């Protein structure tokens, strides 16, 4: 079945970015001159999605206003609401009625990818295998505890190839890590995920973790992934956002050369 819908969870309050997020949701903070949310909407369209569903909070009306303006003849953008901040799994479940009985992409807006290639790979992998497909990358051992961690089938972990996922663990302690491969914020999910989300229990902080539902799929041999080296900007922290602004601006023909010259001048004095 073709993948035509993308879900973007955007209900978080962005407390790391205070006081800026008192006025502007973190998803609308600019990466130079383009809101982070727009990068993800554009990526969804480039990956073949014709519909984007943003899961947001009623406390962030500017997200709904932006969604109305972001619709084009190629992609329709709408919103649904997450009434309580109960985690990523809960946010995804809030999109169930909008998604219907179809596969869909989940795209985390605080992870900006260099292009749409990984999402396209995951869509193609899902359409070929029929299994939920997730983006993966290798990290240093000290970083594993910041991510969902996966164990993949032996001998099937080469970069940019599809891998069978055997186990999923949410942010393990370093001693409990099952590999150096972690989940990044791109998922193509079967509608089966909604039933799994209904079965999982809240974590210690009261949230419903998407990784717990993915772990159930993995236990049923129904989860695969792509280990990628795609350029990725983590804009979930102020420093990550600053780095993304600088690196993306440097790549632009209209401002990159001037910015590069200014940086050289600034740091060679």
What residues fall within each predicted segment?
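Conserved N-terminal catalytic core of the sugar/cofactor nucleotidyltransferase
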Residues: 1-8, 16-19, 29-30, 34-106, ...
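Cofactor-binding loop segments of dinucleotide-utilizing enzymes, especially the Rossmann-like FAD-
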Residues: 11, 56-57, 109, 137-138, ...
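Conserved beta-strand scaffold positions in the cores of enzyme catalytic domains, especially
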Residues: 28, 79, 132, 223-225, ...
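Generic secondary-structure signature for well-ordered alpha-helical cores
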Residues: 46, 68, 97-100, 124-131, ...
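Short, conserved catalytic or adaptor-binding loops enriched in Gly and charged residues
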Residues: 69-74, 156-159, 216-218
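Conserved beta-strand termini and adjacent loop/short-helix elements that scaffold enzyme active sites
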Residues: 80-82, 136, 171, 226-229
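Conserved core of the sugar-phosphate nucleotidyltransferase
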Residues: 114-196, 200, 204
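Conserved alpha/beta core of the MobA/IspD/sugar-nucleotide pyrophosphorylase nucleotidyltransferase superfamily
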Residues: 161-164, 178-269
């Amino acid at each position: 079945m073709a993948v035509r819908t993308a879900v973007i969870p955007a209900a978080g309050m962005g407390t790391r970015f205070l006081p800026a997020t008192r006025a502007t949701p973190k998803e609308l903070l600019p990466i130079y001159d383009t809101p982070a949310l727009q990068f993800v909407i554009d990526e969804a369209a480039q990956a073949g999605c014709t519909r984007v569903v943003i899961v947001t909070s009623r406390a962030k009306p500017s997200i709904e206003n932006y969604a109305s303006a972001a619709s084009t003849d190629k992609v329709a953008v709408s919103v649904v609401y997450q009434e309580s901040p109960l985690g990523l799994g809960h946010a995804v479940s809030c999109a169930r009625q909008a998604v219907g009985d179809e596969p869909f992409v989940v795209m985390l807006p605080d992870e900006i990818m260099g292009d749409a290639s990984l999402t396209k790979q995951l869509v193609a992998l899902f359409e070929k295998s029929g299994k939920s497909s997730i983006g993966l990358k290798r990290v240093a051992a000290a970083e594993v505890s910041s991510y969902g961690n996966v164990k993949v089938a032996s001998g099937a972990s080469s970069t940019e190839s599809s891998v069978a996922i055997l186990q999923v663990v949410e942010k393990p302690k370093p001693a409990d890590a099952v590999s150096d491969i972690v989940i990044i914020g791109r998922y193509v999910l079967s509608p089966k995920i909604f039933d799994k989300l209904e079965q999982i229990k809240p974590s210690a902080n009261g949230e419903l973790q998407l990784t717990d539902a993915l772990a159930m799929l993995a236990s049923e041999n129904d989860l695969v992934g792509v280990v990628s080296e795609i350029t990725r900007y983590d804009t979930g922290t102020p420093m990550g956002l600053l780095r993304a602004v600088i690196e993306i601006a440097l790549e632009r023909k209209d401002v990159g050369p001037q910015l590069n010259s200014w940086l050289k001048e600034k740091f060679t004095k």
